[in-house]
């Protein structure tokens, strides 16, 4: 496939070359641990599945094309992918990181990587001045979620990339919430893009995976080395499932966003809802940035209710929307981040950010939007 094809075509055909032996339309699952060597050191391109597997390679090549990158590496989870990226640096190195960030990323930085002498400063990455003020002589990279999980703040990636270039830093972007269908950070100046592929890329809540895509071959080789050295690989069966999910990424993302935009506007009209966080609302503080740097606003919403008890009642009463962590599946999922996805962050940090027990996060699925509205209403009011 050529890079000038539109996203709808790329997600369907990239990396899915027809099998030359039997004409199979789907890449085979190479469920194998090791490969025949014709003679000592003479292989057909693969020797051991930790260092490379044809099914995983097909996924990695396809995803590098979707993100307009040079090389991709697939990992056993999103956190494994993020950990491999941070391991590109060393003891004494410092990172500037979004203060509203996935709880697992926060835990990795503050409970694991800190033991290795790495440090992080958490700032509002929608504020360029805050990023610049946090940079020190030991800073090596800026790590940005945009939109952030769960408050949906949007960072100006081109502006941050400019700062990183001037200061000799790498820019790493977690693009999980928008996927490459809506946003391509590498085209905006990022050096590395990470994904929890468990979410929109898989799309069916049946695979756990992570991906890293690099802007250069050199960075891609460094990430691949970490993949091989640390062993956090994605297996062939999960690689195949992920490739299957990506084939329908375009139609799913369109429906996710269509539903989310309508739900977000509707939620703002409910007296029970104090505030709605969605970058597709025109009163969102970074609406103009989101509109400029992405092709869509995505399917994630968070909203605030009167208090934690009201939020609990809503979550307990829902019948169509599922109470579960994770996001990006075809079914709508809802949770209270303060009690689940971000519970590893200190209570005082969460409170300062506004991630409280009255905030709920909604991953909008592809159900009929009127059924989702009806479910939320009966959850809030106890009747349909």
Q: Which residue stretches match the model-derived regions?
A:
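N-terminal "arm"/small-domain region of PLP-dependent enzymes with the aminotransferase-like
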Residues: 1-53, 59-62
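PLP-dependent enzyme catalytic core of the Aspartate aminotransferase-like
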Residues: 119, 133, 137-140, 252, ...
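A common structural junction motif
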Residues: 230-231, 318-328, 379-384
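Short, well-ordered beta-strand elements within core beta-sheets of diverse protein domains
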Residues: 242-251, 298-306, 361-365
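Conserved small-domain helix->loop->beta segment predominantly found in fold-type I
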Residues: 261-325, 345-351
